[in-house]
């Protein structure tokens, strides 16, 4: 960003010619070498890096460069000039990903009724199951309709209602990695805990959610889905069912805030948050090629 003003007594802001941080420096310093090493050591395990992904990396590395274009804004009152470089809009870019949240919250205002009660629900699978899904090439996007339909059906059943005219509002997103950047597919739902009759507009409130039952229903539905798709055998299905007798964890968190805008932003944060943040990086050793970062660990409990 570059700012200048007609009042030369005021100290001008000196522009940074490039958007740079610790996270971005990792890509700038090591991407070329990583590409060579990946092909030799990791391509057979994780697959080919597609051209689409390479383009996203290039966008990140060139984000915020004035040479890629900029917009010039001038205040008609004081004459202050603001020059802002174009950004990459890539999800890999942490700065652009954060701005996307604001865009999401604006779009949500068109579809989300903040007068209804909402909860953030996370449908997870155990670590050992996630590892198996990765090894067997499971397409995790299939988890979205499975979890959304399960939540809807259990909410309707709990309210003792029948008919397709009764519906909760549901926004869903799949996240493929956990806080430790490990492969950990899980689904985030931002859903109403109140039910709307879409024909009459009637709102059914104070619906009891069977939280414990939801965990068992999610395990049963997901294992049956994996068996149907040929990802696991009958024997493996029974073994996993016996191993996780308390079900697969489903986390509930009410979405509350003091005003409409904060509710929208919180919802966007749950659904569209990036996988990482620069502030998580504690130390980088470019010689040893190691990164130390902090994250919150969720324990995979069986008992």
Label for each model-derived stretch:
Residues 1-303:
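Beta->alpha loop/short-helix hinge microenvironment recognizer with preference
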């Amino acid at each position: 960003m570059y700012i200048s003003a007609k009042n030369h007594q005021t100290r001008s802001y000196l522009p940074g010619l490039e958007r740079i941080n610790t996270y971005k420096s990792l890509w700038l310093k090591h991407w070329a070498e990583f590409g060579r090493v990946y092909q030799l050591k990791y391509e057979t395990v994780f697959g080919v890096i597609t051209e689409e992904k390479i383009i996203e990396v290039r966008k990140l590395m060139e984000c915020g460069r004035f040479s890629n274009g900029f917009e010039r804004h001038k205040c008609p009152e004081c004459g202050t000039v603001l020059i802002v470089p174009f950004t990459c809009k890539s999800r890999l870019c942490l700065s652009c990903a954060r701005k996307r949240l604001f865009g999401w919250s604006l779009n949500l205002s068109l579809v989300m009724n903040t007068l209804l009660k909402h909860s953030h629900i996370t449908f997870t699978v155990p670590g050992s199951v996630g590892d198996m899904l990765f090894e067997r090439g499971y397409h995790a996007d299939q988890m979205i309709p499975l979890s959304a339909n399960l939540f809807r059906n259990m909410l309707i059943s709990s309210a003792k209602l029948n008919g397709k005219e009764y519906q909760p509002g549901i926004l869903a997103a799949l996240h493929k990695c956990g806080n430790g950047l490990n492969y950990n597919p899980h689904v985030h739902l931002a859903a109403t805990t109140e039910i709307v009759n879409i024909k009459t507009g009637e709102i059914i409130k104070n619906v009891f959610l069977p939280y414990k039952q939801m965990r068992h229903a999610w395990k049963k539905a997901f294992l049956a889905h994996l068996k149907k798709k040929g990802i696991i055998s009958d024997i493996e299905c029974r073994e996993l069912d016996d191993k996780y007798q308390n079900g697969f964890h489903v986390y509930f968190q009410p979405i509350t805030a003091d005003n409409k805008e904060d509710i929208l932003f919180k919802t966007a944060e749950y659904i569209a948050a990036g996988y990482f943040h620069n502030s998580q990086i504690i130390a980088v050793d470019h010689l040893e090629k190691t990164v130390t970062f902090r994250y919150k660990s969720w324990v995979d409990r069986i008992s």
